[in-house]
Curated annotation (Swiss-Prot):
PANTHER family: TRNA N6-ADENOSINE THREONYLCARBAMOYLTRANSFERASE, TRNA N6-ADENOSINE THREONYLCARBAMOYLTRANSFERASE, MITOCHONDRIAL. Binds 1 Fe(2+) ion per subunit. Required for the formation of a threonylcarbamoyl group on adenosine at position 37 (t(6)A37) in tRNAs that read codons beginning with adenine. Is involved in the transfer of the threonylcarbamoyl moiety of threonylcarbamoyl-AMP (TC-AMP) to the N6 group of A37, together with TsaE and TsaB. TsaD likely plays a direct catalytic role in this reaction. It is found in: Cytoplasm. This is tRNA N6-adenosine threonylcarbamoyltransferase. Its EC number is 2.3.1.234. GO terms for cellular component: cytoplasm. The gene is tsaD. HAMAP family: TsaD.
Length: 336
């Protein structure tokens, strides 16, 4: 049987990435050109800057991904691409490159939801057993997803306001930490003590919804009031207290979801899945199901995860025409 090679593109935010997946499960290359240094001085991602960077490097990323995989353009079987959610200008760069490659070589084009990519990155660890539950935590999303089978995703709970990664970046900015602040807050949290009483919104409510705006506001108010009074607060203790509140919320809602949807597997994915504190809490508190977390290199935005997610779409022959457009607000269906 002839080997199948999927060339995948990911440009939904500030990483330009191209990957090659062989026969459903062998990731031959996963090239990532990060723009973090360009956005640090702005304290966040500037959409126009992100789009321009994608344009500048995407051709080189394609060439490097193919070379690293040891294949040529003629060996590629199909092209997969993120078409949402994300920044519309950034998405369009990846879409344009993917569609051009597919058209030039007469290849099928596979549309992939960015969040499905995060979830299916877990496939790189071990074959997934369905049905499963997923906790997706990133800079733009915090949601619990029920997956009845590969490619069938239903939201069962999500944030009412800020995403967890967004909350990390906002409190990091208040403390003067560099963007993105998640990793630094995690490191500082392990050096401090949970001594500040921050709110855990909706933690006792019988639903699967999250809220982080109250926690974020309480943190900002505490920091601001201390500054006004000329008081000095321990950055380590602030980070430890903030992270403890975040983890309490995530753990409480995830446990409720596992009670409501009895599954054997929990996938935890997205950029925040790289958080050491989250991994520690999962290891000690959720022991009755198989918890799968993608390796660190596949937690952030990358095309490898898009390639993994494209396999189920290929199997369903879910191909797109060349008029495929960006859907910046694309979302999974909600469980009825």
């Amino acid at each position: 049987m002839k080997d199948r090679y999927i060339l995948a593109f990911e440009t939904s935010c500030d990483e330009t990435s191209v990957a090659v997946l062989k026969n459903d499960d062998e990731l031959l290359s996963n090239v990532i050109a990060s723009q973090i240094e360009s956005h640090k001085r702005f304290g966040g991602v500037v959409p126009e800057v992100a789009s321009r960077h994608h344009v500048e490097v995407i051709t080189a990323c394609i060439e490097e991904a193919l070379a690293e995989a040891g294949i040529t353009e003629e060996d590629v079987t199909a092209v997969a691409v993120t078409y949402g959610p994300g920044l519309v200008g950034a998405l369009l760069v990846g879409l344009s490159a993917a569609k051009a490659f597919a058209w030039a070589h007469g290849l099928p084009l596979i549309p992939v939801n960015h969040m499905a990519g995060h979830l299916m990155a877990a496939q790189s660890v071990e074959p997934l057993e369905f049905p499963l539950l997923a906790l997706l935590v990133s800079g733009g999303h915090t949601e619990l997803v029920y997956v009845s089978e590969a490619g069938d995703y239903k939201i069962v709970g999500e944030t009412r306001d800020d995403a967890v990664g967004e909350a990390y970046d906002k409190v990091g900015r208040v403390m003067g930490l560099t963007y993105p602040a998640g990793r630094e807050i995690d490191e500082l949290a392990h050096q401090g003590q949970d001594i500040y009483d921050f709110p855990r919104a909706m933690i006792k409510e019988d639903n699967l919804e999250f809220s982080f705006s109250g926690l974020k506001s309480a943190f900002i108010n505490l920091h601001h009031n201390a500054e006004q009074k000329g008081e000095s607060l321990s950055t380590e203790d602030l980070c430890a207290s903030f992270q403890a509140a975040v983890m309490d919320i995530l753990m409480a809602k995830t446990k409720k979801a596992l009670e409501k949807y009895p599954v054997k597997t929990l996938v935890v994915a997205g950029g925040v899945a790289a958080n050491k504190g989250l991994r520690e809490r999962l290891a000690t508190e959720i022991t009755d199901v198989n918890v799968i977390i993608p390796p660190l290199r596949l937690c952030g935005d990358n095309a490898g995860m898009i390639a993994y997610a494209s396999v189920s779409e290929w199997n369903k022959e879910n191909f797109a025409n060349l008029d495929l457009n960006a859907k910046p607000s694309l979302a999974f269906d909600t469980m009825e």
